[in-house]
């Protein structure tokens, strides 16, 4: 091999390694880790991760089980916002699980709390419309549905 062909060989090798890494990561994510299940509305997908099992089991005993699945409360409406949220959350859930750095007990992020709060207000608009204005302000004003009703979706 001539000295001038080394850069081309390195580029081909680097490209092949990068491609192999991407394929390997994709196979791991979608086959071993059941990543395909997160593209559905099946609540069982949330229970794939053992740290979510208690939340899933609590949901199966809650009244919302009859009317809502995980995505109804934990992802925003609309195809693109829903899957952006699922991808973002999936990345961080995977990161924290892989590194062992997930908080115990689990805590909902402020962004995801806002999504859940807006879902409560959407489904229960007939009730929340008549509540005092402090309750109908921004979810981040300190008063939210879960301030008083934090165990409704997931009975402790």
What are these regions (language model features)?
Residues 2-156:
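Short sequence/structural segments immediately N-terminal
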